[in-house]
C-alpha cells in the first residue's frame, strides 16, 4: 500500500472530524455526510498486485460516521418506567421541533392557569405514515385532585359490574381506562364534565396552514362515539369553531397552536409564532361539546389522533387515582 496516500487519506478524515466537531450545528453526523461527499475516493493496491477498491476510505469513514451518528442520538432505555424525566424543564416529543415544556404558565403562554404535562406523542397520517405534528396534553395543576375525586371506588361500584374483587379500586379503574375503549370514553367524559381544565399544544413538524389545522380538529371531534346523539348541538359548535378559527395563511414548522379547555367547557385558541416569539389569541368556542369531544378523543377511544399521546396521558392519570 502507498503509505503516502494512506497518510493523506487519514489527514483528510481528521480535518473532516475536526471541522464537524467545531460546527455550531448540533448535528455533527449531518455535517460529516456533507463534507465526506466532497472527499475524492482513491484506489490502493492490495496483495498480489490486485486492486482493493476504496477499502481504507470505507473502513475509516465508517468508524468516523458511526462515532458522530451515535454522538448525536439521545440515549434510549428500553426498560424505562418514567416517561417524564426528572430534573428537567422540557422533553423531546419530536427531534424536528423544539422540546415541549413540562410546565406551561401564564408567564410564557396566554393561558389562565398553570398546566403540567400529562402526555405527549406524534400525529401520523394513517395512509402514508408520515408525521404531521407533535402533540402535548396538559392538565391544570390545581385540578389534579379531580381525577381521584371523580374516579373513585364509589364511581366504580355505581357504574361498572365487571369489577374484579381481587384487585384494588385503582387497579380496576386502571384496567378499564387502558383496556376497554367504550368504558374509557365514559370515564374520560365524566372527568371532563367535572370541570377539569386541560390544554393541548400542537406543533407542526412540517410547514402547513390554518385551514389544514382546523380541518384536522373537526375530523378529530367528529369521530367521537356520541356525535350521532348530538348532531344539532355539535353542528352549532363546529360553526363557532369555524368563526374562532377564521385566521388564514401559513403555519411554519415549529410554531404552536395552543388549545385551552376552560373550566366552563369553552375552548380558547391561541397561536404562537415561534420565530418572532409572538402570541395571538384567535378566538373562543363556548359550545361545551366541542371542547369535551376534542379532549375526549385525545385521551381515549380507538380513534385517538395520537395513540402515543393517549397512552402516556392515561398512564399519568392512573398515577393520580
From Swiss-Prot:
It comes from Saccharomyces cerevisiae (strain JAY291) (Baker's yeast). Residues 1-72 form a transit peptide. PANTHER family: FATTY-ACID-BINDING PROTEIN 2 (PTHR47284:SF3). GO terms for molecular function: intramolecular lyase activity. It is found in: Mitochondrion. Gene3D superfamilies: 3.50.70.10. This is Altered inheritance of mitochondria protein 18, mitochondrial. Belongs to the AIM18/AIM46 family. Keywords: Mitochondrion, Transit peptide. Transmembrane segments: none annotated. The gene is AIM18. The keyword Mitochondrion applies. GO terms for cellular component: mitochondrion.
